[in-house]
Amino acid sequence: MPSTMIPAGYMAKYVARKPEWLQAPAVQDIYSVSNCVSQAFADYINFWKHNGYWLFDSPDIIRAVAREQSVLLEGTSLFYYEAYEEEFDDATWHPYAPEPSFQTNVAVPASRRLEGLDVVTFLARNSPECSPLSCNGLAGELHTNAHCLLPSFEDAQASVASGRFNNSEPGPYRIFAVYSVEWS
């Protein structure tokens, strides 16, 4: 993993089993950053408690939002994300930053398990939009793990730079490390 991965935040998600239409035999479930297949715990953006990456700075903030909005977290899995400091658009890598109007102060978990890397579209340049590995079925063309994620940063970066994501959703594309975290 490159040293340029930045703590981006947390999300509680309802992990979906592999959809029948996804032609990727190794995939069992979807740990994507996007909410297209595995849904977030709530339609959280309207609560305005997210950070500049449109994720949450800590699990405690997710719990507080769920409590305030009477949303049950039962059945959700907790994920922590780190983002590569550059996004890919127009055939080159460019630096980007979190949305500055939101405070971003991510609490890095003491314990986490790397599940793989996801490539996520950010056409509007704020919140995660689509994960083409699951949303567009690219997991059927690229080597992914049981969670529909790429096995390494190098695989993700090379796949993006070589144009493997070009015919999916419009970019820019950002690379995220996806970690499982235990609810404590």
Describe each PLM feature range:
Residues 2-52, 99-145, 171-179:
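Short aromatic-glycine-(Arg/Gly/Cys) micro-motifs in beta-strand/loop hairpins
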Residues 49-103, 147-149, 155-184:
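Short, mixed-charge low-complexity intrinsically disordered segments
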